[in-house]
């Protein structure tokens, strides 16, 4: 869980920017999107195989 404390004399926009940066660095949002819907293990394997094939070429 990312936590951001608003500093003294810091605007809300700056604090929000720092929060967004910390969330993107930790990969929290990407992980939530990935786990939004259940994915069968066979589908996971297929996607992983296709991604490896894409990287190879």
From Swiss-Prot:
Keywords of this entry: Ribonucleoprotein, Ribosomal protein
Entry's Gene Ontology molecular function annotations: structural constituent of ribosome
Domain of life (superkingdom): Bacteria
Protein name as annotated: Small ribosomal subunit protein bS21
TM segment ranges: none
Family: Belongs to the bacterial ribosomal protein bS21 family.
Alphabetical list of PANTHER family matching this protein: MITOCHONDRIAL 28S RIBOSOMAL PROTEIN S21, SMALL RIBOSOMAL SUBUNIT PROTEIN BS21
Gene3D superfamilies: Ribosomal protein S8 (1.20.5.1150)
Keyword check for Lipid metabolism: no
Pfam families, sorted: Ribosomal_S21 (PF01165)
Annotated InterPro entries: Ribosomal_bS21, Ribosomal_bS21_CS, Ribosomal_bS21_sf
């Amino acid at each position: 869980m990312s936590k951001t404390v608003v500093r003294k004399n810091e605007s809300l926009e700056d604090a929000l920017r720092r929060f967004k940066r910390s969330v993107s660095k930790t990969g929290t949002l990407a992980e939530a999107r990935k786990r939004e819907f259940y994915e069968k293990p066979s589908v996971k394997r297929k996607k992983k195989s296709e991604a490896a094939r894409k990287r190879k070429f």
